[in-house]
């Protein structure tokens, strides 16, 4: 049962799709953990308290300090693209170790095909911090869906679909487009 991996559907829904799975496999490789021995339970332990919904999984894999940290959206976006495009060859090194840790902490739980991150944004200052755990006052938490820089402007298209849903009377979480480093991304409030 490939879809649910032997788990009840409501729990299997916490497992990430292509993007989060790419990060998980790269993390396993860099942690010298053979993927062939990993079970869905191990994967849920990696997700821990960073699942998209209300569920948390214990014991959680320790991914380091869980306090919020500043996020350089453009640098993280560039590194996320590298991980997605070169997932079999990108390796943890001295130059990218902090980016790698940040990416795993805020980007490995959201599902879906395209890279995304959980961030918190201060609408007054524009500062972006990690959106996992306790966030500072004055910040709002978002799912930031990176534009994938393909032939289609996915972020802008998703915003158009969001506006169409609002115009049709469908209740949606507030969403917006924001540009970082010349690249426009779609953000939806959590």
Whereabouts are the PLM-identified features?
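Phosphate/dinucleotide-binding and metal-coordinating scaffold of catalytic cores
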Residues: 1-190
